[in-house]
Regions:
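Catalytic center-proximal scaffold of phosphoryl-transfer enzymes
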Residues: 1-312
C-alpha cells in the first residue's frame, strides 16, 4: 500500500499527541527531580508559525541528566524563541546545578538553579584565536598558552573519572585550582596587552566574563568540566535537520521534539529505539484504560529485556 507523506505525518502527530506525549511528561517530572542537569539549544525552522515569517528562527531546547544519574533522560522542547522564560518554565520544580554554555539567558534563571560554565567553550575560543595566526607564529603564542591551560584541566580531569564525587572534589581543589588561579592571573595580565576586538581579546573576555560559572564545577564532585554531554545529545537532532530541513507547523515541531526525546532517551539507556517504541505503542492503548499511572510504567527504565540492544 502506498502512503502519502501527509498521511504518515498525520499518523506521527496523532501518535505523539495521544500516547508518546504522556510518556514524555512522565520523563519530564523525573528529570526535574535530578540534582544535576545539562542544557543546550539550537535553531530550527518552522514554516507556519502564527504571526511569524517562514524564515524566522525558532529553537529546539535540550535538557538532559548528568553522568551521576542512575537513569539517563534526554528531552527536547520546541519553542519559537530563545527567551530565558522558556528554560525557566521547563525547569519549574527543578533545584540544583545546570550545565550550560555562555548564553546569558541561563544566567537569568531563578537562584535555586546554579549555572555551571563550559570549559570546552572556553578552550574553543583560544583554538579560534590560534587559527587566525600563521602556522609559524602559533607555537608559544598567547593563544597557544591559553589553550594549553584549558587542555591541562581536561587532562587532569581524565585521571579523576573513576573516583567518587567526594574524592574528585578533593583532587580538583588540590590539582586543578592552582591551574585555574594561574590561568586567571595570566588572563588579567594579558588583557591590558591585547586588542579587545581581536580573536585573542574575545577569548580572554569570554574567560573573564564567564569565570564565576566556569569555576562552579569545583564546588561539587558530581559536576563536569564541560557541557559536552548536552552537545552530544543535540547532535542527532542537528544531523537530522540536514535531511528534513524544517518543520511545517508548530504541532509538527512539537511532535518531533517528543519523538526525538523518546528515541534518544532509549538509546542513552541501552535500548533499541524501534523495539522500545513498538513496546510503548503496543501497551499504551490497553494500559491507559485501567491505570492512571500508565505512562510511568512505559518509561525506558521499565522496558523488558527484549527492548535492549543485543550485546556484541
Amino acid at each position: 500500500m502506498k502512503l502519502s507523506r501527509q498521511t504518515m505525518a498525520n499518523w506521527l502527530l496523532k501518535v505523539s499527541e495521544k500516547w508518546l506525549q504522556s510518556v514524555y511528561d512522565a520523563l519530564h517530572k523525573r528529570l526535574c527531580k535530578e540534582p544535576v542537569l545539562h542544557a543546550d539549544e539550537t535553531t530550527v525552522q518552522v514554516l507556519k508559525e502564527p504571526g511569524r515569517s517562514s524564515t524566522s528562527k525558532s529553537y529546539m531546547w535540550l535538557y538532559r541528566t548528568s553522568g551521576c544519574a542512575k537513569q539517563a533522560i534526554v528531552l527536547y522542547e520546541y519553542k519559537p524563541t530563545r527567551k530565558a522564560e522558556h528554560a525557566e518554565a521547563f525547569l519549574k520544580g527543578f533545584s540544583g546545578w545546570l550545565h550550560a554554555d555562555g548564553y546569558q539567558g541561563y544566567h537569568r534563571l531563578p537562584g535555586n538553579i546554579r549555572v555551571v560554565g563550559c570549559w570546552a567553550h572556553a578552550r574553543r575560543k583560544f583554538d579560534e584565536a590560534l587559527g587566525t595566526l600563521p602556522q609559524e607564529k602559533r607555537k608559544d603564542s598567547p593563544a597557544a598558552i591559553g589553550e594549553c591551560y584549558c587542555s591541562q584541566l581536561f587532562k587532569l580531569e581524565q585521571a579523576l573519572a573513576e573516583l567518587t564525587p567526594e574524592e574528585r572534589y578533593e583532587k580538583r581543589l588540590e590539582q586543578e585550582k592552582p591551574v585555574l588561579d594561574a590561568l586567571l592571573s595570566w588572563a588579567n595580565e594579558m588583557q591590558a596587552k591585547t586588542a579587545p576586538k581581536s580573536a585573542l581579546g574575545k577569548a580572554i573576555h569570554y574567560l573573564q566574563e564567564q569565570w564565576p560559572y566556569l569555576t562552579k564545577y569545583l564546588e561539587d564532585g558530581r559536576l563536569e568540566l564541560s557541557n559536552n554531554r548536552a552537545e552530544r545529545s543535540m547532535k542527532p537532532f542537528v544531523m537530522g535537520g540536514k535531511n528534513w530541513l524544517f518543520a511545517n507547523t508548530p504541532g509538527g515541531a512539537q511532535a518531533s521534539s517528543v519523538i526525538y526525546s523518546l528515541i534518544e532517551t532509549a538509546k542513552a539507556n541501552g535500548l533499541d529505539p524501534y523495539r522500545y517504541l513498538l513496546w510503548v505503542l503496543q501497551n499504551a492503548p490497553q494500559l491507559s484504560k485501567t491505570d492512571e499511572a500508565w505512562a510511568e510504567k512505559l518509561l525506558p527504565a521499565n522496558a523488558p529485556e527484549e527492548c535492549y540492544m543485543p550485546h556484541k
